[in-house]
Amino acid sequence: MIRLMQESDVDHVAAIECLVQTHPWSKQQFQESLVSHQCTVYEQANQVVGFCILQPVLDEANLLLMAIHPSQQGKGLGYALLDYSIEQLKNNPIQIFLEVRESNRAAIRLYEKAQFHQIDLRKNYYPNGDGSREHAVIMVRTCTDDFAALFQ
């Protein structure tokens, strides 16, 4: 079941975040996101196994964070969660932006399947645990067939 994130989900969401990110968000950041962002979770057998945080901004949105528990990856849950979360955006965005580590090929494939495409590369953006840095792939999904709306 996919539903809106609740404050009682924050511990589970933060635990998943720690499993998949080298620089995870804090519990406080997740709690603050509940106020101003659209936060959804994927729940199976009363257990949160994934989450998605979208930031609506005027007529656009930013995908800030998304993760599926490693034991549940590769089962289509991420695509279902992303698709549902985008459909629930109340601002009907013209475009949705995201950035992802260049090495995160599984996430890039998921985003491409969800109709995102690369528009830029932010060099040396993400810090790695060993002190090196990694490029961020900037992607966008256009949510309108009205080409003129992109330039208003």
Annotated model-derived regions:
Residues I2, V100:
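Conserved SAM-binding loop
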Residues Q47, M66-D83, R101-R109, K113-A114, ...:
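Conserved glycine-rich acetyl-CoA-binding loop
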Residues Q31, S103, Y125-Y126:
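Conserved beta-strand edge residues that scaffold enzyme active sites
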Residues A67, F97-E99, I138-V140:
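Short aromatic/hydrophobic contact patches that present stacked aromatics
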Residues L4-S71, Y79-L89, T142-Q152:
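Acetyl-CoA-dependent GNAT
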Residues D59, F97-E99, H117-E134:
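Conserved catalytic-core motifs of GNAT/GCN5-like acyltransferases
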Residues H37-C39, R133-I138:
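Short hydrophobic/aromatic beta-strand or adjacent loop that forms the aromatic wall/cage
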Residues L89-E99:
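Conserved GNAT acetyl-CoA-binding A-motif
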